[in-house]
């Protein structure tokens, strides 16, 4: 009896069907600089170098982590792609880069074209929100590698910034103002802890008054906010000295990454409201507050550092973008040879 690749668990026809299903989602994301379409060996992007004095390419890669476990359990796959794009483009935007193009890696044990198309639909929506082109990706069917119905995602974003406009935190000084910009919820970090705290006690369809009657699935799968266009718009109006994308490690772990040695950011907890999902995780899981801050964004998905004289203009620019933001602290002198962030209660 002859043996085929399909017999071994890899269905090439299903992969081809997936490509056909995702093309209508990817096509609207394409920018004028993109040469060719989806399905080639490599994505082609003709960078318009005339827009820059000294163009610097900026790259970022990330995944969605165990938030995917919630998507599997809820059988919802059309928003985790937004999370994937957000985790990558937010990282490159905080140095001042405009996201240009994006690629994804989708790996699963048994390929379902319909499920994969839902994932890519979300990726395309994320690219639309970020203003970047989805120019390619890889679909890997790996029999026996994942549980049935499960998959993993990785994303890759490339952007560009003019060298004189790179935001690297070197101009941050004592007395500068720290502005926190609202997150949409947990974003894509801390889900192993959130799942342990909540999903061992409650089903995903459980509704909490504290969540405005939403189900746990709704709250946990709220897509990560994409800040790329907001960052670029703010930089057009205010000389922001530093940005931090608040991901794994929370405020204490991420704010210092953009500060010069010898400085510390002191943030006052009462200056911003905390979304109910964080209080729910803390209470139901009996998670210490310090652990919450080391794990989650605690309501601030992005932090900007500006000179005191630019504080009002920064808030006005953020309001104009429809973003909630608060002055949450200031930069003080710190210990020699290190940068730190402290949240004061």
UniProtKB/Swiss-Prot annotation:
Pfam families from the entry?
Answer: AIRS (PF00586), AIRS_C (PF02769)
Q: Which GO terms describe its molecular function?
A: ATP binding; phosphoribosylamine-glycine ligase activity; phosphoribosylformylglycinamidine cyclo-ligase activity
List the InterPro entries hit by this protein, alphabetically.
PurM-like_C_dom (IPR010918), PurM-like_C_sf (IPR036676), PurM-like_N (IPR016188), PurM-like_N_sf (IPR036921), PurM_cligase (IPR004733)
Q: What is its EC number?
A: 6.3.3.1
Q: Which UniProt keywords apply?
A: ATP-binding, Cytoplasm, Ligase, Nucleotide-binding, Purine biosynthesis
Which catalysed reactions does the entry list for this protein? 2-formamido-N(1)-(5-O-phospho-beta-D-ribosyl)acetamidine + ATP = 5-amino-1-(5-phospho-beta-D-ribosyl)imidazole + ADP + phosphate + H(+)
Say where the protein is mainly found.
cytoplasm
For this entry, the protein name equals: Phosphoribosylformylglycinamidine cyclo-ligase
Per the UniProt record, the source organism is Anaeromyxobacter dehalogenans (strain 2CP-1 / ATCC BAA-258)
Q: What is the lineage of its organism?
A: Bacteria, Pseudomonadati, Myxococcota, Myxococcia, Myxococcales
């Amino acid at each position: 009896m002859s043996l085929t690749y399909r017999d071994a668990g890899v269905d090439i026809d299903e992969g081809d069907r997936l490509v056909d299903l995702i093309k209508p989602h990817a096509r609207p994301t394409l920018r004028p600089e993109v040469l060719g379409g989806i399905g080639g060996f490599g994505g082609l992007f003709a960078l318009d170098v005339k827009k820059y004095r000294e163009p610097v390419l900026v790259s970022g890669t990330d995944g969605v982590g165990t938030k995917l476990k919630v998507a599997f359990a809820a059988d919802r796959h059309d928003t985790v792609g937004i999370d994937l794009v957000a985790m990558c483009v937010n990282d490159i935007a905080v140095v001042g880069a405009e996201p240009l193009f994006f690629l994804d890696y989708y790996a699963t044990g048994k390929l379902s074209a319909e499920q994969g198309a839902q994932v890519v639909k979300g990726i395309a929506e994320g690219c639309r929100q970020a203003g970047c082109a989805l120019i390619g990706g890889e679909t890997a069917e790996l029999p026996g590698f994942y549980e049935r119905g499960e998959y993993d995602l990785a994303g890759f974003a490339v952007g560009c910034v003019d060298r004189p406009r790179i935001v690297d935190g070197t101009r941050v000084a004592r007395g500068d103002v720290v502005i926190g910009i609202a997150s949409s919820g947990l974003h894509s970090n801390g889900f192993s802890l959130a799942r342990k705290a909540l999903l061992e006690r409650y089903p995903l369809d459980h509704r909490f008054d504290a969540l405005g009657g939403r189900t746990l699935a709704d709250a946990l799968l709220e897509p990560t906010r994409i800040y790329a266009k907001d960052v670029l718009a703010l930089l057009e109006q205010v000389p922001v000295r530093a940005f931090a994308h608040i991901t794994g490690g929370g405020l204490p772990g991420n704010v210092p990454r953009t500060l010069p040695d010898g400085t510390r950011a002191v943030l006052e907890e009462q200056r911003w409201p905390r979304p109910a999902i964080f209080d729910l995780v803390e209470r139901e899981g009996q998670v210490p507050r310090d652990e919450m801050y080391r794990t989650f964004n605690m309501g601030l998905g992005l932090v900007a550092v500006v000179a005191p004289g630019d504080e009002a203009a920064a808030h006005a620019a953020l309001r104009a973008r429809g973003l909630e933001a608060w002055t949450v602290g200031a930069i003080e002198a710190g210990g020699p040879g290190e940068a730190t962030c402290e949240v004061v209660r």
